[in-house]
Amino acid sequence: MQTIELTDGGILLYNDAFLPPDLADRYFAELRDHCAWEQKPGVFGHMQPRLIASYGEPGIVYRYSGRDNVALPWTPTLLEIKEKIEAVQGRYNYCLLNRYRSGQDSMGMHADDEPEMGNVIGSLSLGATRKFRIKHNKSKETMSLPVGNGTLIIMAGTMQQFWKHEIPKTKENVGERINLTFRQIMEPA
């Protein structure tokens, strides 16, 4: 696991071989075939350029972009993956999955800085390799890392406060990718 210390206290833990390829392939197929995928409207009413699914503890709701994402119950596969990531860092009660069907599916520059969310996010990539790009809010400093089949990134420290991240579109002919972002959602008081 490589530790990348970022400006203003952001931390990235990066392991491009967190899962062996055969296990990553198995997880990819199970999640692709059995998750409750949906495409939701995003900002300004346009459909999000990816499919999403939400899983977690009973009663957990993650609100972003003005939409409530109610967690479905954990699947055995997601619990198995969650335990592997928690062994590295963090405790998680929610997982937002993003399914990128081609290079045209993307996630724009954003920070996961909602007040009800903890500051540690475990992000596992399965399937095709894409570019994970980060940008500092003030200095505009950037960095890109390849996220391929079995890559784990842990975003921690002040990452969400001072940095934004994205999965940009690509014209390259890439296959499908599933990204799992494990989070700790604080229940409302």
Annotate each PLM feature.
Residues M1-A189:
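Non-heme Fe(II) oxygenase metal-center motifs and adjacent flexible, charged/small-residue loops
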